[in-house]
C-alpha cells in the first residue's frame, strides 16, 4: 500500500496498478478503483 495525504498522490500508482487513475486516500492509505 502507498501512504498518502491526498488522493492526487495515489493517481500515478493506481494508474500503474489498475490502468485507471482513480483513487481515494483512506486512513492515509491509497485505495485504487478500476474505472
From Swiss-Prot:
It comes from Pandinus imperator. One of its GO terms (molecular function) is toxin activity. Disulfide bonds join 4-25, 10-30, 14-32. Potent inhibitor of the A-type voltage-gated potassium channels. Most potent inhibitor of Kv1.2/KCNA2 channels. Reversibly block the Shaker B potassium-channels (Kv1.1 sub-family), but with a lower affinity than PiTX-K alpha. Keywords: Disulfide bond, Ion channel impairing toxin, Neurotoxin, Potassium channel impairing toxin, Secreted, Toxin, Voltage-gated potassium channel impairing toxin. It is found in: Secreted. It holds the Pfam family Toxin_2. This is Potassium channel toxin alpha-KTx 7.2. Expressed by the venom gland. SUPFAM superfamilies: Scorpion toxin-like. The record marks 24 as: Basic residue of the functional dyad. Gene3D superfamilies: Knottin, scorpion toxin-like. Belongs to the short scorpion toxin superfamily. Potassium channel inhibitor family. Alpha-KTx 07 subfamily. Has the structural arrangement of an alpha-helix connected to a beta-sheet by disulfide bonds (CSalpha/beta). GO terms for cellular component: extracellular region. The record marks 33 as: Aromatic residue of the functional dyad. InterPro entries: Scorpion_toxin-like_sf, Scorpion_toxinS_K_inh.
